């Protein structure tokens, strides 16, 4: 039972990290993270994701100029772009790739690395062009990845009684 509790504690301990140490992430750790991500669930086991590792400083700067909230990329040793094949999973590619993205974030956290999810379907065509992605691959997520140089406090989360409904919306399960 304690293993389950430890896993739940692990889940709630993850934070978005926006400041990183000037220390490279070894390639074997990057590959371990991406190896875990490929086991994320996807509709009909379509696995519509591809991962682009971006280490080039100039390329990270170019992404930073394209995307409004990409400043954490500039201080991170690398970025991982999750590109989704919308043809492989036309009705659920966004959810599928969100699953893979979360697996990346959790695997990185398990290895002591920090991440922050930057991309949210903004400037898709510009990022596709910059990374030479074919039209069918949509950059769903850009993650800054590195060794944390901050320890953010937990942000306020809504109480369960505010978000859990029973049988139909508006019938709060945990009403006070």
Regions from the PLM with identified roles:
Residues 1-176:
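Acidic, surface-exposed loops and disordered segments
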């Amino acid at each position: 039972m304690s293993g389950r509790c430890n896993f739940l504690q692990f889940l709630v301990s993850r934070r978005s990290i926006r400041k990183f140490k000037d220390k490279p992430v070894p390639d074997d750790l990057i590959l371990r993270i991406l190896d875990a991500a490929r086991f994320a669930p996807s509709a009909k086991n379509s696995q519509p994701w591809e991962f682009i590792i971006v280490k080039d400083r100039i390329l990270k700067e170019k992404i930073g100029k394209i995307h409004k909230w990409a400043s954490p990329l500039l201080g991170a040793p690398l970025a991982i772009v999750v590109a989704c094949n919308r043809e492989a999973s036309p009705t659920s590619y966004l959810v599928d790739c969100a699953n893979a993205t979360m697996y990346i974030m959790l695997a990185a956290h398990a290895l002591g690395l920090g991440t922050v999810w930057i991309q949210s379907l903004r400037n898709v065509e510009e990022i596709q062009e910059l990374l030479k992605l074919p039209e069918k691959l949509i950059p769903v997520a850009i993650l800054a990845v590195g060794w944390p140089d901050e320890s953010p406090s937990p942000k306020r989360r809504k109480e369960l009684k505010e978000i859990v409904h029973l049988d139909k919306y508006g019938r709060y399960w945990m009403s006070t």
